[in-house]
């Protein structure tokens, strides 16, 4: 019983406080303190928690997060979303359900630049939903398309979630994680487009008129600076010209230039509000990271990963079954916990387990983030689901049924990425990671 006491206290206190509605940062910190106090005296436990809080934030890599958050907020206010939508409409062409395809492609592009699924759902839903309804699309279907596709950009770099995973996994290469996310992210987007197209054909949704050559040229020309930004950031990181942290600073400078000078969608007077939004978001994320470092130490000190591995081995010694169980657990976790805290808390638990099975940490990072992408679209706590419904002004219960085909295809892609490592590992290995 003494051996299990720190673990029981840690998770018992954590989930009890979550059930009471205690903010997750406090739930993590207090449950960690209580768990460590079962092994050390209170003052020593308090010292460990405070040291881990400070050391967890003492990382040059972490500087990328506030810069990418600021860059995303500038994009959200700077008219970039509208230009990406116009570009996506050209790519969608006259396919059945073209506006749904446009929504998915625009979310992939905007999410890849901003790194925020919530921002993508809000920005794209605000523009695309009224257009789709006007063209005769079912409002619930339109919302489901927006919600399901918003997280695709979290796999397509740059991604704050992959940066967080790199930190908590012990320094997995960020460039390798960025490379590994491309194919799964694009595969997920294409799979969603297939489902949207099938539904559009069955329901007889109209095809848009073919754009004139001039309209296509203008849309592509106006989107080139935003597309070039993705190429600049990723090309610089992968070529070694600059680090991910330096890339994030370049992203801020570039988006400021686009929004203030080129597109002129915001003025200098709008910047304090954007900076304040970014500071608040950054503070929340960094508090979560710092407090989670103490929890990770408490779990490692109590040998939680090895206990989990022993438990899974008693169920089955088949890696396929063990990975299936881990995916099911992560999917359940994703339904009630936001992405960043879930990655911070459960990576230290499951990463040692999967590495024992021979799974590459880069591969597992993509699997974990893909699980969380599904989770944030799922009730009861899915943040993207709530934002998507608030934008379209529809209750969540109206969206669940239209979401079911998209959930199915997302789980199918998850299974493919889990059991076919080449999907995520081909690019990193080809470039020497």
Each PLM stretch: what is its role?
Residues 1-433:
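Alpha-helical transmembrane segments of multi-pass membrane transport proteins
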């Amino acid at each position: 019983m003494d051996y299990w006491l720190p673990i029981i206290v840690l998770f018992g206190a954590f989930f009890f406080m979550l059930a009471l509605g205690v903010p997750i940062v406090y739930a993590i910190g207090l449950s960690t303190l209580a768990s460590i106090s079962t092994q050390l005296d209170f003052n020593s436990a308090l010292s460990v928690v405070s040291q881990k809080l400070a050391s967890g934030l003492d990382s040059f890599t972490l500087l990328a997060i506030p810069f990418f958050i600021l860059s995303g907020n500038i994009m959200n206010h700077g008219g970039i979303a509208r230009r990406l939508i116009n570009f996506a409409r050209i790519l969608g062409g006259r396919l059945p359900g073209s506006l749904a395809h446009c929504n998915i492609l625009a979310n992939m592009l905007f999410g890849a630049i901003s790194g925020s699924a919530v921002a993508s759902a809000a920005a794209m839903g605000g523009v695309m939903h009224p257009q789709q309804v006007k063209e005769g699309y079912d409002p619930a279907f339109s919302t489901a398309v927006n919600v399901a596709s918003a997280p695709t950009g979290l796999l397509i770099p740059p991604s704050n979630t992959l940066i967080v995973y790199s930190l908590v996994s012990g320094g997995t290469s960020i460039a390798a994680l960025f490379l590994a996310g491309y194919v799964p992210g694009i595969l997920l987007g294409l799979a969603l487009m297939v489902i949207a197209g099938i539904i559009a054909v069955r329901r007889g949704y109209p095809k848009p008129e073919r754009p004139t050559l001039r309209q296509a040229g203008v849309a592509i020309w106006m989107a080139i600076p935003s597309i070039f930004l993705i190429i600049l950031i990723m090309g610089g990181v992968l070529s070694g010209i600059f680090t991910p942290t330096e890339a994030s600073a370049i992203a801020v400078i570039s988006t400021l230039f686009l929004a203030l000078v080129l597109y002129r969608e915001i003025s200098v007077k709008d910047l304090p509000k954007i900076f304040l939004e970014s500071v608040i978001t950054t503070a929340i994320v960094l508090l979560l990271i710092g407090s989670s470092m103490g929890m990770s130490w408490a779990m490692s000190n109590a040998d939680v990963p090895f206990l989990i591995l022993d438990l899974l081995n008693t169920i089955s010694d088949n890696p396929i079954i063990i990975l299936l169980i881990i995916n099911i657990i992560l999917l359940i976790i994703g339904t009630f916990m936001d992405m960043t805290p879930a990655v911070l808390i459960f990576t230290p638990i499951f990463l040692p387990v999967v590495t024992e099975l021979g799974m590459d940490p880069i591969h597992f990072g993509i699997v974990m983030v893909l699980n969380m992408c599904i989770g944030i679209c799922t009730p009861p706590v899915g943040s993207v689901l709530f934002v998507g419904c608030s934008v379209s002004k529809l209750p969540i219960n109206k969206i669940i049924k239209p979401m079911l085909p998209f959930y199915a295809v997302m789980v199918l892609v998850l299974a493919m990425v889990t059991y076919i490592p080449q999907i995520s590992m081909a690019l990193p290995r080809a470039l020497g990671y």
